């Protein structure tokens, strides 16, 4: 496992068109030369959706698209942020007075999350100012983790300016925790793969303690990303945080049903650990203990033996106070079955049978069905795109990322890649002008990329 510090690499900026362009724009904007550059990649989750925050392992890989920041420390305490994309306005604040507005998921707030995470980790009251120019080529709100990549990039920028050191694991944990400043209750997958990724391999990411294991993907097949072009801004919607709460409530009701100390339980994985049984057995417990009809707040209170006031003040998060019903059975069933699929996927990759691509594809298809029917995080466009991808030769296709929009990931035999891309282009993008305009960043094959690092000009 890569537990060491993020790498620092010396580069000839003139030989890298994107770095050179960023350097020139930085100079034009701030009247000085960047001291260093930091990049942090986006990711595609191959399998294991909505289970990291329930305590279960996931199987992502870094994509080649990333966030890239040019940085120039300054002698004042002013933090100045600019973006190469004019859609994202400049922002300036005092480095020692960072305020993050949860109600406004504006681009600079994700930078501030990473900055503040490092500040709080070291207990610093005085921070140096800096000029930063951000350049991202991860499609925003696409489920490829552009926002978390920006948080990670900002964390590594801040650490580098301070001249301090942390391991990749520590950085991932700090950035996962600090993204919650903006109201996103994620589980840590996005930040972990952004730091722990290595070129040429996917990773099984496990939590508590955080660790990453190489997973060699089968030769003869490629992963293709296709963007539905339906944007989903994770922090601006209640869907995601309601699912987090439904999983937490399901864990508590299951724990109470099995006579465990339910009030200490937060995650579905904890119930399985406490009972010491397999995922398959947990699915049977779920069938036995939970019903398919939505639970009202009153019924949850009755199950747990608590008052409505206790439910509101001790369990429900601020952004789920208005919810009247919760689907516990469906969410628990998705989580336990998806966690099992992740382990099966890894086992197939390790055993590498002749029909590995077929087996992995079927696991991806099962995952999408569960996301659509049990977790209800798909949307009509994603379902249509998945169907198109399967129709034109993908062995497996599923939504990736939070869902409710964003991207699909498909497993495609390498020898059919060209015809697959042409067919999907024609069926999903060609007849729709807004999709067609974004297609360059919406349909592409990808291979596992490397993790976050610092560039110094040679």
Swiss-Prot record:
The record marks 43 as: Transition state stabilizer. The active site is at 190 (proton acceptor). Disulfide bonds: none annotated. GO terms for cellular component: cytosol. It catalyses: N-acetyl-alpha-D-galactosamine + ATP = N-acetyl-alpha-D-galactosamine 1-phosphate + ADP + H(+). ATP binds at residues 143, 145-146, 233-234. The keyword Coiled coil does not apply. Alpha-D-galactose binds at residues 43, 49-50, 52, 190. Its EC number is 2.7.1.157. One of its GO terms (molecular function) is ATP binding. InterPro entries: Galactokinase, Galactokinase_CS, GalKase_N, GHMP_kinase_C_dom, GHMP_kinase_C_sf, GHMP_kinase_N_dom, GHMP_knse_ATP-bd_CS, Mevalonate/galactokinase. It comes from the Eukaryota. One of its GO terms (biological process) is galactose metabolic process. Coiled coil: none annotated. NCBIfam families: gal_kin. Acts on GalNAc. Also acts as a galactokinase when galactose is present at high concentrations. Monomer. PANTHER family: GALACTOKINASE-RELATED, MEVALONATE KINASE/GALACTOKINASE. This is N-acetylgalactosamine kinase. It comes from Rattus norvegicus. The gene is Galk2.
């Amino acid at each position: 496992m890569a537990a060491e510090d993020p790498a620092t690499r010396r580069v000839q900026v003139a030989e890298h068109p994107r770095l050179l362009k960023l350097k020139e724009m930085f100079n034009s904007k701030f009247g000085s030369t960047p001291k260093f550059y930091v990049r942090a990649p986006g990711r595609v989750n191959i399998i294991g959706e909505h289970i990291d925050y329930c305590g279960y392992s996931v199987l992502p890989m870094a994509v080649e698209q990333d966030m890239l920041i040019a940085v120039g420390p300054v002698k004042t305490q002013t933090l100045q942020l600019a973006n190469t994309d004019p859609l994202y306005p400049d922002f300036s604040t005092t480095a020692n007075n960072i305020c993050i507005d949860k109600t406004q998921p504006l681009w600079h707030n994700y930078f501030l999350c990473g900055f503040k995470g490092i500040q709080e980790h070291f207990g610093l009251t005085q921070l140096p100012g800096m000029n930063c120019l951000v350049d991202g080529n991860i499609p925003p709100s696409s489920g490829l983790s552009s926002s978390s990549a920006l948080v990670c990039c900002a964390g590594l920028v801040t650490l580098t300016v301070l001249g301090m050191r942390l391991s990749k694991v520590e950085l991932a944990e700090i950035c996962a925790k600090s993204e919650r400043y903006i109201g996103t209750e994620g589980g840590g997958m996005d930040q972990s793969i952004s730091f722990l990724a290595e070129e040429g391999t996917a990773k099984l990411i496990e939590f508590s303690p955080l660790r990453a294991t190489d997973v060699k993907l089968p030769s003869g097949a490629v992963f293709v990303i296709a963007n539905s072009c339906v944007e989903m801004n994770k922090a601006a919607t209640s869907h995601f945080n309601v699912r987090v709460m439904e999983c937490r409530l399901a864990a508590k009701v299951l724990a109470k049903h099995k006579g465990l100390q339910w009030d200490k339980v937060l995650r579905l994985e904890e119930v399985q650990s406490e009972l010491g049984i397999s995922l398959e057995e947990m699915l049977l417990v779920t069938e036995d203990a939970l019903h398919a009809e939505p639970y009202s707040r009153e019924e949850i209170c009755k199950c747990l033996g608590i008052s409505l006031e206790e439910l509101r003040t001790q369990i429900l998060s601020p952004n789920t106070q208005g919810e009247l019903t919760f689907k516990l059975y469906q969410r628990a069933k998705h989580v336990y079955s998806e966690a099992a699929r992740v382990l099966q996927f890894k086992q197939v990759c390790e055993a590498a049978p002749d029909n590995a691509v077929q087996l992995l594809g079927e696991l991806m298809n099962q995952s999408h069905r569960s996301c659509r029917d049990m977790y209800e995080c798909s949307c009509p466009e994603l379902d249509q795109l998945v169907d198109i991808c399967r129709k034109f030769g993908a062995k497996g296709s599923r939504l990736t990322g939070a869902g409710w929009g964003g991207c699909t990931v498909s497993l495609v035999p390498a020898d059919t890649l060209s015809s697959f891309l042409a067919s999907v282009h024609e069926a999903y993008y060609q007849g729709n002008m807004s999709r067609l305009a974004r297609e360059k960043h919406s349909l592409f094959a990808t291979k596992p990329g490397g993790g976050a690092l610092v560039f110094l000009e040679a």
